[in-house]
């Protein structure tokens, strides 16, 4: 009975911590190569909006990894997914810290984003471990591309946010490579397209609220 409840309790704990607790990083936030410069009000608002989008992405990452771990058939894979979730928690803390520093708020829709991502993670996990890993690899590839686009949009003066995004991009690429090495299956093109569409909706809405 206890072993049956363990994934449920883990998932519930992860949801509460992600949505309502102050995130704590195991690594210090990346230090910028140069001191931050002065930003105009419009630049600060845009930086805050972009980091809100990135924070939502990390909320979703927690949901995805937790859900996939809950239904993973291989105990080794389950442990790997939970480890990745813990590593992504650094990103959650860093982006929240930058939101606070920029005077911006997290998305008010975070519970909705979390629930949707958790559902997707359950579906992906139920498809079997190779496809679940394929979902991880494709998600991380798309996130990496998304972060690269943000480096082109963040104000040059916001070196603190840029340092965070650059390190996140490195970490996401590593997670994608680890999923592939673990036996990820290539997802069908329609699945990738749907993932990009869902991501576009999320980023567009989260940029505003």
Swiss-Prot record:
One GO MF term on file is: metal ion binding
Q: Where is the composition biased (Low complexity)?
A: 23-36
Query: What enzyme category does the UniProt record give?
Result: oxidoreductase
Enzyme Commission designation: 1.14.99.60
So which cofactors does this thing need? Fe cation
Report one GO cellular component: plasma membrane
The family database entries (Gene3D superfamilies) matched by this protein are listed as:
1.20.1260.10
Main subcellular location of this protein, as a coarse class: membrane
**Keyword Membrane: yes or no?**
yes
Cite the entry's keywords alphabetically. Cell membrane, Iron, Membrane, Metal-binding, Monooxygenase, Oxidoreductase, Ubiquinone biosynthesis
Membrane-protein topology? Peripheral membrane protein
Q: Where is this region: Disordered?
A: 23-42
Q: Which Pfam families match?
A: COQ7 (PF03232)
Cofactor note (record): Binds 2 iron ions per subunit.
For the biological process aspect of GO, one term held by this record is: ubiquinone biosynthetic process
The reaction(s) annotated as catalysed by this protein in its Swiss-Prot or TrEMBL entry are:
a 5-methoxy-2-methyl-3-(all-trans-polyprenyl)benzene-1,4-diol + AH2 + O2 = a 3-demethylubiquinol + A + H2O
Protein family membership: Belongs to the COQ7 family.
- What protein does this entry describe? 3-demethoxyubiquinol 3-hydroxylase
